[in-house]
UniProtKB/Swiss-Prot annotation:
The lineage of its organism: Eukaryota, Metazoa, Chordata, Craniata, Vertebrata. This is Antigen-presenting glycoprotein CD1d2. Glycans are attached at N25, N38, N60, N128, N183. Pfam families: C1-set (PF07654), MHC_I_3 (PF16497). GO terms for biological process: innate immune response; positive regulation of interleukin-2 production; positive regulation of interleukin-4 production; positive regulation of NK T cell activation; positive regulation of T cell mediated cytotoxicity. Heterodimer with B2M (beta-2-microglobulin). Interacts with MHC II and CD74. It comes from Mus musculus. Antigen-presenting protein that binds self and non-self glycolipids and presents them to T-cell receptors on natural killer T-cells.
Amino acid sequence: MRYLPCLLLWAFLQVWGQSEVQQKNYTFRCLQTSSFANISWSRTDSLILLGDLQTHRWSNDSATISFTKPWSQGKLSNQQWEKLQHMFQVYRVSFTRDIQELVKMMSPKEDYPIEIQLSTGCEMYPGNASESFFHVAFQGKYAVRFRGTSWQRVLGAPSWLDLPIKVLNADQGTSATVQTLLNDTWPQFARGLLEAGKSDLEKQEKPVAWLSSVPSSAHGHLQLVCHVSGFYPKPVWVMWMRGDQEQQGTHRGDFLPNADETWYLQATLDVEAGEEAGLACRVKHSSLGGQDIILYWDARQAPVGLIVFIVLIMLVVVGAVVYYIWRRRSAYQDIR
C-alpha cells in the first residue's frame, strides 16, 4: 500500500547524531491538504512548521519542495536532501493514485468531491524526549489516527472506514515504515532543524498595543478594542481590566500573522456607553520581561481633552491680542 505520507523517510536514520538539548517544547508538523474534484482532477499542497515558523512549502504546481528559511535543510547534505525530495515526489504520485483506487472500492458509499488532510510530526520536549502523531481528516473531520502499531478509526468517524483501515493494517511493511517514521525519523529530523534554526526560534519581538472603539450591535453600548501587534513568539495574554479585576466579557479574536512572521491579536469588550471609565487593557508577553503593557481608556481620552483645552487657550490669546490691537488703534485715532 502507498496511502501514507513520507513512507520512505526511514532512510533518514543514517543522517543525524545527537542535537543540543533544548530548553522548551516545540511542535514539528508536516501538513498536507489533498482535494479530489473527480477521478481526473486533484490537487495536493504541503508545508512543514517548526513551532510557529514555516520551514518548507510544496505547492501542487511545483515539482520541488521550497525552503522558506536559510536553515530549512537542517543537518542534511545536498545529496541527502535531493534523495529525500525524490522520495516525496514518488510518494505524492502514489498517494493520488491510491486515493482514486480507494474511492472506486468504496463507491457508491463515498464519491467525489473528496477532501483529505494529513497532520504528522512530533512534540519535542527538553532532554531529547518526544511524542509523535499521525492524524488524518476526511471531509474536514478528524477520522483516522496511527497509534502504537496500527491505524485506528477515531470515535464518531464513519464506519465505512473500517474496510480501508483493515487493508492498511494488513500491510505489515507499511505499518513498520510508519512506526519508523514516527519513532525515529521525525524526532531526529526535527531536532536537526531545531539546532539549525535556534536563533530564529528563540527570537523575542515586543508587542505594540493601542486602543480604539467601534459601535456595538447592542443599543446604547460601545465595543472597546485593544489591538496587540508585532509580537513573537505567539503566546500572549491580553485582558480588559477594571482595577485588578479581569473583565470576563473580554473576547479574544484569532491570531493573525503579520508579513514579518510576528502576530496580531485583538481583545474586545462590550460595555454600556459611559461605563468605559476606569477600564484598561493589560498585555503580558515573554519579550516584556515582566513589565506588562497597561493602556488606560481614560488616558486615551486625555489627548482629546488636552487638544480642546489648548484650542480654547489659543482662542483666548488670539482674542486678547485682537482686542489689544483694536484698543491701540482706537486710542491713536482719538489723539489725531
